[in-house]
Each structure stands twice: as structure tokens, then as C-alpha cells.
């Protein structure tokens, strides 16, 4: 199939440019970029819209295998495509844990015809128990693009040291969920005035920051590429900024909920606002925004964490952590970061394209002739009110219901195939 994307504002996140031009797509590849005409191609009118490299969410939980009642590869990638993502990287905290080549191969096989490209992340330790290293070379050989025990932090520094030494030899990125689970044990939300008022045990910022500091030092010692997942505190941003100034090979991500919501969202004991790391203070939100603005934080990722209704419809302390994010992330980025001028369009797009690709050691994230046609088109003027009942994810655990978002994806193309167009998924 031939498509001519006509008159759009093409975003180059590497060159940091916006150019009004056309893109010709043929046989799944970008054939040509320029002022074009092609009588045989189907024209996609893109005037006034941003034509971007296909967005990647490098931190999602697709829940397959083992928890398909929450989400599966089909439903999760459909949600991704609707949200403007052509690629996702899925975390290994499935059942069984993705700690061996067979599970990685299974995920890739199930994702072969999915609505978005799926890049599995393998576990650091067997069962994500933090005791015995996985066969990392086998995981890489099977297709794992990085290593993480996400949600189950490796508490033993000697184990984490050996993890980084082996990962460095394999040229793989270690993704760290930074939490000292002795300091956070029993915690339900951020430790502060709101937790005291609600009578909920708090999780101090220190629980995150002490592990950020440890893992940065281990990365500096081993030379291993370290990526810090969903940092949430002012102190963490400062530690990453200082480490980058020293030349440590560290990158970091932030989620839309951590640059949008504060601990106040938990008022009324809303379980959809219960996440880990928890929603923090306004000063932390501002620090995350500044980290995104100055480049300290490289990536925006959702930590899409679906849970069934019955799991969240319980007393606060019994509810699992997590919220969905694939279908609201882009709107939140444009509404909360681009429109107020915190990020330019190319800067925002970089955190969803070339930067996550670079972190994971993947090619892509830029629109160039001769590369696969993975494309996301954004209408910067289009607004919608979030209706959780209409989201494509199996789970509806979002705190953003009834939020009005402006700047939404109107087309996603995966390897030259239209997956979503005009806010409708194409079957």
C-alpha cells in the first residue's frame, strides 16, 4: 500500500526541527520526504498536524502471561495504538516471570500481529527475587531489549553490582525501580501532611532517593548503562543531574502522573491514585517538570499498570498500586507540558521517540527515507474529555476521568500499516 502524508508539520526530534513537508510511504517503508505528488498513493491530509516518528512507551505492563484478566498483548497494544504509540516495551513481572528465553519467545510470538510493536524486557534475577542472576545472554538472544526487576527492587547491593557487570559485558541497559523496601514497607502513599490527615502510612522520598544514589554509584563503578524508571522526587532529579554532569551513563524517565498529579489526588481515598512510586508534593512535580525541560529526564513513559475493577474497588490499603496510561499520556504531555511552554514539540517528541530508542539500544525514533514507516500524527487543536468506559484497555483504573485533554493522536502507522485513523482503531 502506498500512502502520501501531505502537508503535515514533520517533527525531527534529533535535529530539533519542524518542517512543513510530505512523506511517501511504500511497502512498509518511508520512500521519500519532500514536496511530493503521487497519483497512485492514498493521500492522508495532515495540514496543521504534527507528523512524528512513531511513539514508543518503554515502560508498560501487558500482564501476559498470567494476568490476562487485567490486560493482554492484544488489548494492551490496541490501547497503545489508540494512544499514539507504535511501540511498547513490556516489563517482566508476569506469571511466570520473564526470566528465561522461553517466556521472551512466547511474548514475541503472541505479539507478532499485535497493533503495536512489542519489545520484551527480561528479568534481572530469577523470579525477580533478587537472589540469583538470570541467564542474561539467553534473554538477549531470545529478544529481550533490556533487563529489569521492575516493582521488585534488588535490595542486595552485591547482587546489583554483579547484575551491572554482566549487563555491561552484554551491552544491555539495566532498568531500575528505585525503592528501599524496608523504608517503604507498609506505605500506602507519600509521607507528608496528606498521609497524616488520612491516617495512611507514608512512603518517604528517601526510600527512592537512597536507591537512586546507590544505583548511580554502581553504574559509575561498572560503566553499565543504567536507566532509572519513574523517578518522582526533587532529590532524585538532583541526583541524576549531578551524575550526568560527572559523565555517569545514566538516563531517567518520568510518568505523566508524576508531572501532573500530587498527593492531593489521594484525598477521598481514591484507589486509582494509588501508585508506586507514590504521587508526591507540588515541589516534586515542579522538579520533574524542570528535569524534563533541562534534559535531566530523558524519557516520558506511562508505567501503564492495569488492574481489574474488583481489585481497585476495595479499601485503600488493600488496593494494588498502579494506573493505566497508554490512552491518556499524549494528551497529558501536550496539555501539561507543550501548551504551557515547558517543552517544545520536538523536545516532547524526543522523549517519546529517539530517546527511548537510544536508551534501549534500538535503531529508530526518526523519520528518514529507507526506514520502517512507524508514524504518529498529532492534531494539536483536537480536544476530548477522558471517558474511562470508552478506553480500549481491559482495565479502567485511571484518575484522569473527566479531564479535558488537548493535542491528541489522530493516526498511528505501524510498519506502513494504518492501525488507528481519526480516533478510530482499524480492525
Swiss-Prot record:
Co-factor binding comment: Binds 2 Zn(2+) ions per subunit.
Signal peptide: none
Co-factor requirement: Zn(2+)
GO biological process, one term: purine nucleobase catabolic process
Family that this chain belongs to: Belongs to the metallo-dependent hydrolases superfamily. DHOase family. Class I DHOase subfamily.
Gene that specifies this protein: pyrC
Residues the record lists as binding Zn(2+) 1: 59, 61, 150, 303
Catalytic activity: (S)-dihydroorotate + H2O = N-carbamoyl-L-aspartate + H(+)
Cited InterPro entries: Amidohydro-rel, DHOase, DHOase/Allantoinase_Hydrolase, Dihydroorotase_CS, Metal-dep_hydrolase_composite, Metal_Hydrolase
Gene3D superfamilies documented for this protein: Metal-dependent hydrolases (3.20.20.140), Urease, subunit C, domain 1 (2.30.40.10)
Residues annotated for Zn(2+) 2 binding in this entry: 150, 177, 230
Keywords: Hydrolase, Metal-binding, Pyrimidine biosynthesis, Zinc
Residues reported to bind substrate: 61-63, 93, 276, 307
Protein name: Dihydroorotase
Pathway where it operates: Pyrimidine metabolism; UMP biosynthesis via de novo pathway; (S)-dihydroorotate from bicarbonate: step 3/3
Job description of the protein: Catalyzes the reversible cyclization of carbamoyl aspartate to dihydroorotate.
Species this chain originates from: Desulforamulus reducens (strain ATCC BAA-1160 / DSM 100696 / MI-1) (Desulfotomaculum reducens)
HAMAP family found in the cross-reference section: PyrC_classI_B
Record bears the keyword Hydrolase: yes
One GO CC term, this protein: cytoplasm
Keyword Translocase: no
